[in-house]
Amino acid sequence: MRKIFLLSAYLLCSVFVRAVEIPFQKSEVKSIMRKVADWQIANPHPAPEHDDLNWPQGALYVGMVDWAELAEKEDGDDTYYKWLTRIGRRNCWQPDKRFYHADDIAVSQSFLDLYRKYKDEEMIVPTLARTEWIINHPSKGSFKLVEGDLKTLERWTWCDALFMAPPVYAKLYMLTGDKKYKIARATCR
């Protein structure tokens, strides 16, 4: 009896869930994506510690590059590529200040994507210089992450660091074919 009740409850719930599912149309999803992108552009983070080159912006730019590609491909709208390019130009395509810190090179992911699209050497030179320097001067910092000890942030010892820095090295490898970027990515500089 109990099995029949549980089976009946499961079937009723699954029918009810299916009945309330509302599939989104592609145009609706794109409209929401556009609204979110436009809101992000119109409402930059006001805190000075989250300037153009800081990691939250780097994460935003990664998503914005994907949106820019879609908006241009499907709607002929290059607004978002132009916005990303303005950010790169006003910062001279530089990563953020701390050389070894994974967060501070995250913005380079979008700069490299823009380089891939436009083939403008200016977009890639600062990232190449930074990664070359890091490869030639590997951190001697500990792999043990110590709360409050900034020296331990020289190594990619926290989980989101794997989103921040290794993709830059992977993209450089894809762009140049130079295996040193593949090796550097694998060694957690």
What are the residue ranges of the model-derived segments?
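Bacterial Sec-dependent N-terminal signal peptides
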Residues: 1-21
